[in-house]
């Protein structure tokens, strides 16, 4: 599903040049749950942004679904993103002015899904994540754990092949963190490929693989011990 070859990302200003990723080679198969760990500033989020087609590499190759996508135009990246990738962020990234139902529905609007189908699919997602009683509430009326479950529901509403999660439990207490990890695990068991950046060794163990980055390079890539 995913393969990078000598992937490099360099950030430049007039005064300094910073190498965020240094010849990263990873291969991720369909159906895997991969946790990415490492200290702050090691390149975890940079790698996730490139894998999610939110940024371009400075060098190397990136293959997604057997296509070399590193030189794609913004329109090509956008089309590939909206049809194949779901995102879950640490800060939830919900729109405060929209209800929970409307937040979850939003990606379907970009896909031009008919109204009747949107309603059915949104309600199905809300039921799955125990959010139906909250569908007419606004994000600020929900707990952190509930907001993150809304974010996960929004990420899966388009039925993506791949979910990218950047510190999805970072703003949550342990109980709500476990809820989110349980949701991601269930999605993975149903066949969705998941790549998750985390600082937590405990949550990293939910992955079938754990990749450690340091100074922009992969230093270890080992099998995890999935939580039961």
Regions found by a protein language model. Give the residues of each.
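ABC family nucleotide-binding domain
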Residues: 1-213
């Amino acid at each position: 599903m995913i393969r990078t070859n000598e992937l490099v990302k360099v950030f430049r200003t007039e005064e300094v040049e910073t190498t965020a990723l240094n010849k990263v080679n990873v291969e991720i198969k369909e159906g895997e749950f991969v946790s990415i760990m490492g200290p702050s500033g090691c390149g975890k989020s940079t790698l996730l942004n490139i894998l999610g087609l939110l940024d371009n590499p400075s060098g190397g190759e990136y293959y997604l679904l057997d296509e070399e996508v590193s030189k794609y135009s913004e329109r090509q990246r956008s089309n590939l993103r909206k049809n194949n990738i779901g995102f879950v962020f640490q800060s939830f990234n919900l729109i405060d002015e929209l209800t929970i139902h409307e937040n979850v529905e939003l990606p379907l609007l970009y896909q031009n899904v008919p109204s009747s189908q949107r309603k059915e699919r949104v309600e199905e997602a809300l039921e799955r994540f125990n959010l139906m009683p909250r569908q007419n509430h606004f994000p600020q009326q929900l707990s952190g754990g509930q907001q993150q479950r809304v974010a996960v529901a929004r990420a899966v509403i388009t039925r993506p092949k791949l979910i990218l999660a950047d510190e999805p439990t970072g703003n949550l207490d342990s109980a709500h963190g476990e809820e989110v990890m349980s949701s991601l695990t269930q999605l993975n068991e149903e066949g969705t490929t998941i790549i998750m950046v985390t600082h937590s060794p405990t949550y990293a163990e939910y992955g079938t693989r754990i990749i450690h980055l340091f100074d922009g390079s992969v230093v270890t890539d080992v099998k995890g011990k999935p939580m039961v």
